[in-house]
Amino acid sequence: RSTVLQSYAGAMPDSLNLSARDIMLPVVPMFHVNAWGTPYIAAMVGCTLVLPGPGLDGASLTALIDEYKVTIALGVPTIWQGLLLAAKAVNSSLPTLKRNVIGGSACPPAMMKTFRDVYDCETIHAWGMTETSPLGSLNQLKSKHNALSDDEKLQIRLSQGRPPFGVEVRITEQEKGMVEQPNDGNTSGNLQIRGHWIINAYYGKNESALTEDGWFDTGDIATIDADGFINLQDRAKDLIKSGGEWISSVELENIAMGHPKIAMAAAIAAIHRKWDERPIIIAIKAQDSDITEAELLHYFSDKIAKWQIPDRVIFVDSIPLTGTGKMLKKDLREQFGSVLLESETN
């Protein structure tokens, strides 16, 4: 029942807007919430489904999109990063690709702009998790947004959008679990969700996974505006608390990846004797890039408050990823979390 309801919700115009005229490529493994539930939606509406197999590199995906005339594709940002590099290398304009759905982690603004300006492809930002089967929200603009400029629309598209009919979301005060916060777009708190395809309990466990009043706490920190658009600030476990003030790792990563000489970046908390935690950036340079630590740190200077600017940039050859393409920040914290303490002793 829950899968059928979610499939109906996912196919709606304000969701994926899928029909029998579409050709869909989910670049998401079947072990990850059944490829985000897309095979069920495709079967329901008669959409052609193209499965990528083991070839998840940019060149293979570019060839698949061009050969099968894919109209909509889904994946995490690291997948699209490889696709954009490959499409540019082979001079493909991806002419049939009209919509790409990005979830799993926040889409960098520069990536969304590239899809829009270079490939005339609409990016649909989405949010969900295994416990939400996974559909939690999708970003489709409202009619009142039509009059906005492209850059103003982009700022709205960078949010995770609105929940479809069938689920509800709310935010609660971070320190006091069930104190509901206003939907003013500014007040942040714990993102909680409930609905027809949301978890009740984990497999093999008798106790409920929900709060006393029936909501599932997602572990995300977010704001919700008056139109219901969710804007994820961070995973609660990835927030950086420096001197009692919160710093969003997502915001720092988006800034770093907006630099043309950076291919990938992760922001993590490093232990600091005075401030408890300070942000540092772990980054991979773009091909043939000669960027320095000082150059990247200066890039932050006019974009955020001075106290939010990372203390260090550490360049690496690779960043560990999960099987679904998400950065393994736990591993990065274990490897680099003491780097500021080490620099004090040297």
Please give the residue ranges for each predicted region.
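Conserved S/T- and glycine-rich ATP-binding loop of Class I adenylate-forming
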Residues: M24, M30, I65, A73, ...
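Conserved AMP-binding/adenylate-forming
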Residues: C47, N100, C107-A126, T130-I230, ...
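Conserved AMP-binding/adenylation subdomain of ANL enzymes
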Residues: V4-I23, V33-T71, A86
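AMP-binding/adenylate-forming catalytic core of the ANL superfamily
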Residues: D66, A73, G195, N200-A201, ...
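Conserved helix-loop-beta element of the AMP-binding
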Residues: T3, D22-L25, V50, T71-G75, ...
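Acidic/polar alpha-helix N-cap and adjacent early helical turns
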Residues: Q335-N346
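Short, hinge-like loop/turn segments at secondary-structure boundaries
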Residues: Y68-V70, N91-S93, L141-H145, A283
